[in-house]
Amino acid sequence: MSLGDVKEQLRGSRTEAKNAAKLIQVQFERVRNGGTTSVALRALKYELNILRQLCCALQENFHQHADIYCDIAADMLPHVAPHLPQPDYWVNHLMSLQYIHHALCREQTIKQCQRFYELINAQSCQMQNKSEYKYYIDIHIRHVYFFGHQLGKQSAASEAKAQLCQALQALGKLLENMLQLKAEQNEGYSELMGELNQLLGKRSIGYLKNLASLPLTAMNRLWKPLFKLIACNGGTTDQLNAQFSEYLSALLALLQLDDNVWQLQQSEAQAQTPLSLQLLHSCRELYKNQTAQNNVLQLLYNYLKLLNTQSADLKRSYIDLAKKFVHFFEHKAVSHVQEQWYLDFLFVLVRVQKHLHQIDNKVPSLERFWQCLGGQDSATAYAAHFELLQCLTSRVMKIGRGSPLAASCSGNDASCPSVLKHCVFTLGCCATVAYSSWQPEAQATLPKASQLCLASIIHYAIDVAKVTKCLTPNSSELVTFAWYLINMAEKVTTATQMYLLEHLLKPLQELRPLLSPPYAQQLVRRLFKASAHSSNPELSALLHGAYIVSMSCPARQFQQLCVFYHTPKNDTEQCLLELCEKSPLCSPLNATEKRKLYELDMLAVLANKKTPKLLQSLLRHCQTDYQMVLLGRQMRTDKRSAGQQIEELRVRLQRLGRKQQLTRLQQLILGHATVTKLLEAAETQKIKIHIKEMTEKTLEVLLVKYKLFDLTISSEMPLLELATTAIGAFESFYEQADAEPLSSDEALIDWEALIDDGIAAAMALSTMGYIPQADNAWLLLLRICRLLGDRFNYLRALSHFLPRYTQHALFDLPAEVSHAEQLLDELWPQLHAAHLLKRHHTTVLLCLCNLALYYARLDCVRHAQLLLLHAQRLRLEFEERAGKCDIIQLTIQTVRFRMCYQQRHCRSLARLPTALQQLDTLTESVRSFTCISSMDNGALILLLGDMVRDTTECTANRLSELPNFSNSLLQLLLQSGLVLRAVELLISWLWTNLRMECLDKAHSKLRLIEHFLGMQPLLESRAALEQTSNKGSLTLAPMDAQSKHMTELVGKMLVMQLEQSGACVEPIRKQQQLTMSSPRRELPLPSARPKLQRYVSLDMQQSHPMLRSSVQLQCIYFMAGCLHARLYFLNREHEQLDDFYALANAWLQQNAARGNALGHMLLVLHIYQANYLRARRRQQQAIELTETALKLAGSEQLQQRIDVNYRYNLLLQLRTAQLELEPPSKPQNPRRALTFNISPEEKLPRPVRKVATASKKPAKFAIYTEDVRPASSTTSSSSSSSSSENASSPERKSTKSKSPKRLDLNACQLIDIIDLSDDETEAVVQLQPAKSTSALSTRSTRTRAQRQPDTLVAPLRRTATAPNPLSAEATPKTIGTRARARRQNTAEQPTTTTTATPKVDSVSSRRRHRN
């Protein structure tokens, strides 16, 4: 068969390939047994031809017959040998073997590869010359490389390891044969290291790691002959210079291999010299004649040897060696800087440094070196190390070209043009690793010069990182560098360590954009932590600000901002944005980021550190109008900063709002700006008035002294408009939330500021007394606080409604009360929590008190008392409130007072003191008031305003005087310019003056009211009064002796009467001695008198728009008119009263809301009108009016919030009018005089009895008594108060005694007493003296009750019982008068009084019967 047939059969089917193999075997045996001298050559040629055919077949991918090919090779290889005369045949033979082995090194033919490699190793290594070793080396290296990768596979690991060991042993044998051949031929292997670098220097780290896992015994069979061969290998200078880089490349590979061996086989590795040192030792022998190369190899050998040894003198040796390197580079290497071997050595030394610092290794093999280098006295060694790194950095930066041995790009880009930059960056990483791995205690000992050296190295690394394109945020080199920088900052514990970082801040700012966000944020965070050890507070603040800016979570940013402003060292007066402009590490921010950061910064400043300079810094950097108004809220005391800007903004928004609808954000801005203007205007109008000047007689003088002529209701309207505008803007912002949502990108809404300003506006409305507008404001706050979950402000808003309403037209008050009770159940057990302030305590306790009043008006009296008791007990748990009269104690007393005098069910309040006793306690509590929380003063003004109204109603219906706190309240109101509240107080005061018939004082109050209401200026009123006084003083006649005597007589009788009355002084109006013969002052002419109609028919064209639309203000005018009409009635001036009452009734019928707004004053109007009708003999009209008023008083609308005595007064009015319309048929008998306050029902006819025998007992006048039991207030107080309301006003006429002699007060004579009529023309029965006898005088000292046992006796009081200790403690008894003291002493005795029919026509009783 020809060669061509064999070729076809080898590429054919498997059977054909087997047939070809048999045929080849037969033919090869035939050739080998030819018997000629050329048999060996012919066999070699035949074998070479067959190997070529196998190479061609494998090249054409016929690997399925690889086992047959190996059989063919196995038959021929043992029988061929080199032919010396023709060496090319053997070379071709080796080339064919090399090719076949390469072709079989694949996954499909791995078994055949192993078999073929074993066939090659089974033959002896026959080399004819030094060049043939390359083919053997290539085969072995190829086999090691292929099975080195197979070693990573677990399924073939053991078999691959065996093959690698076999290959290394075969390679060692080859090197031994080469040593033998070199000894025979004396020729060097100049290219040997380049061939071996195919196995070592040009392979990956993973491949070298696989080799390191082989047994050291197998590896040593390769390295020992290799190092011997290198040491004895020679060559020319050019050859050695050319091979220098190859040796250095092998050195780098062996360094890596040593490291891997140390990690995998540490115990075995420690027992032998590292391979890298053995290589350097052989290279020193090789380059012993090359001085320059020998020097660098010697330095490198000593350096690596020092790294792998442990000695006590390591630090000193390292310092000396580092100095030798520096000396070499600065002096000896100057002449070689352009030579390639020098560049290669320089880059190798850089990579040795990288290997030394173990940047790429997770398990450092040179840890022993760093342990020996560190410890005590290591600062000098580290300083030498940093000096060496700086020297290398400076030399690398001066290199003009690169080297293949330079550190490769992290992206394994062979074409990376930044090789030199990578080297500089690597040295910077090495310096960072060395310093960060050093002990923190030792870092503090590094000299500042060495710190600057280290800083320069890192600075160079950052400079090249900025311009190196392949250093991306995700590159391993940059990530490693950033990690060690973070570690450096983390270990800072002293100011010395911080000194280094201070010099790195500017370079780190340039590095920050190159880092990924997590590493950049972590770096800034560690620098901020390290700044705690800095001696520069400003730098610490800058770094803290940079850290806050680097955060991405707004919640964490705000938290850190609070920490920033609470830091004791931080005394900066600059906002965060201003600090960012100076900070060395703050990244640039876009407009959106700046706005969000500014809003967070502003919120943190407002919550933690509101210093003027810091607020001004924020104001300089504000970006929106909303931010400006939020700052303006905090700078309201500094008008120069933002006041003008905010006012201009408010005016601009108001003008814009007239043209178009404002957006939600604009409405919010307008609301804040308006509140700022409101508070500024309220503060501007405040004045200072001394309390000593606030007396009832000098009020008009006070207004003139302080020039309060412009203080009228019109002057208060701008404040009212500002407050209502602000609330309207806030309401529009709240109501349009769904229609116009706001994102956080537009504005970060400060709801706390909105609630605070809303409360400010609502408090302004409440303090000024405009209740409808205040209701709208507090209702808005109620809804907002419930939506936001602001529990305390929700309870504060609800507390506005609880004392005033049980139902409200604008919202479901019972549902809100139910929700508030749930909040109170949650809050009151937590009141002692540390985070709660005193105002929070006040809010909860006030809500409990007001809730008690709410339930009391719903007739849930017991529940109300329990709530008050609970509030009292909670109050006593706070040390700062115990023993003091705070707003809570005052409110509890006020609620109990209201419950007492407004309660219809007396038995439920049986153990409470009477209303007048509680009123004395309230007076003392106001005098001793103590402010505890920030909201107490505002709550006190509101409480006093309501208290004046309630106490006036109570005392007026009980014939008592106003408590003493009116002066103090009026002082506060006038100082604050609160006109409407002042008018309400003056109206209450006027009511009391009219009730006490102090007409001069009433005239004074009326002039003040008219001035404040803008009806008549005070100066005009006083001028008219002076003219009238001057004219009236001319008509006064001198008092004769008899008139003086009568005056003294009446005065003594009144004194005796008051002394004998015991405990009944307080319910009776304090008496005044009157001049009997003094005529009335002449009143102005009817044409000059003010018209009452002006109080009802207001000039709507000239009045303020708020007045035209405000029912409350109209009712204020109306009440003033009612009291003015009462003053006319007391002065017996009836000309305008008919028209006024007709207009009043028509005015009330026009709008039902007016009657609701008047409240109890509507009943007072009916009582006054009934008095007038009775005085005009219109009893039937009076009866009809009184019956209507009784129905009104019993309605659900009024009965829950008025004095209970109104009903009794109206009943007495009705009964009196009925008696006057149908007088009793029986004549009235004379009775003893000086029996006062006999109601119409008690005026029963009695038979006249003869005068009894004389008695030595003194005269005793028992009118009625009043004990401490509160349940009886509905009888005696009503009877006493009603007695002053049930009679018409008669004409005052002087009474003269018919006898010219002086009367003997020791002999009281029996006189006839008749009831005074309302008709002025009715004849007045004068006092008729009876027969004067001594016995009669003696007997006359006894009362009718003593002389007539069958007289009807009516007990007015139940026996007083011991008061409740809790209620007594909550409402202590404060005795205001001497009579009150007597009443307490006689409280245990039940008192009776007799009913009498005749009326006494005495001077002392005439004023009381006028009502």
UniProtKB/Swiss-Prot annotation:
<comment type="subunit">
    <text>Interacts with pim and Sse. Cleavage of thr contributes to inactivation of Sse.</text>
</comment>
<feature type="region of interest" description="Separase cleavage-site">
    <location>
        <begin position="1065"/>
        <end position="1071"/>
    </location>
</feature>
<feature type="region of interest" description="Disordered">
    <location>
        <begin position="1221"/>
        <end position="1240"/>
    </location>
</feature>
<keyword id="KW-0217">Developmental protein</keyword>
<protein>
    <recommendedName>
        <fullName>Protein three rows</fullName>
    </recommendedName>
</protein>
<feature type="region of interest" description="Disordered">
    <location>
        <begin position="1268"/>
        <end position="1301"/>
    </location>
</feature>
<feature type="compositionally biased region" description="Low complexity">
    <location>
        <begin position="1386"/>
        <end position="1398"/>
    </location>
</feature>
<dbReference type="GO" id="GO:0007443">
    <property type="term" value="P:Malpighian tubule morphogenesis"/>
</dbReference>
<keyword id="KW-0131">Cell cycle</keyword>
<feature type="compositionally biased region" description="Low complexity">
    <location>
        <begin position="1270"/>
        <end position="1289"/>
    </location>
</feature>
<feature type="region of interest" description="Disordered">
    <location>
        <begin position="1330"/>
        <end position="1411"/>
    </location>
</feature>
<comment type="function">
    <text>Required specifically for chromosome disjunction during all mitoses; maternally provided protein is sufficient until mitosis 14 then zygotic protein is required. Involved in formation and/or maintenance of epithelial structures: bud extension during Malpighian tubule development, and foregut and hindgut morphogenesis.</text>
</comment>
<keyword id="KW-0963">Cytoplasm</keyword>
<dbReference type="GO" id="GO:0005737">
    <property type="term" value="C:cytoplasm"/>
</dbReference>
<dbReference type="GO" id="GO:0051301">
    <property type="term" value="P:cell division"/>
</dbReference>
<keyword id="KW-0498">Mitosis</keyword>
<dbReference type="GO" id="GO:0000070">
    <property type="term" value="P:mitotic sister chromatid segregation"/>
</dbReference>
<keyword id="KW-0132">Cell division</keyword>
